[in-house]
């Protein structure tokens, strides 16, 4: 399963590592390169540096291939906006979304 995780903090890093170990194809998006470097070094996970509320960042992260989006930034507003943007980008294609609020 392809899972897109937005937010590479403590929660996002843990969820990404766990899901990757279970055999899922995981992509993590964060505005900061530092936590993404650690995730890449410790796991077989693709990362994207950028603002996930920007549709071009979601496109770069290949949101159209994701089956699930998990938004776990520190901002509930950002998490909700990312979920809405991702669903909008997918059009009629179903996408399960989980937002930390």
Name these PLM-found stretches:
Residues 1-101:
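Cytosolic regulatory regions of ion transport systems
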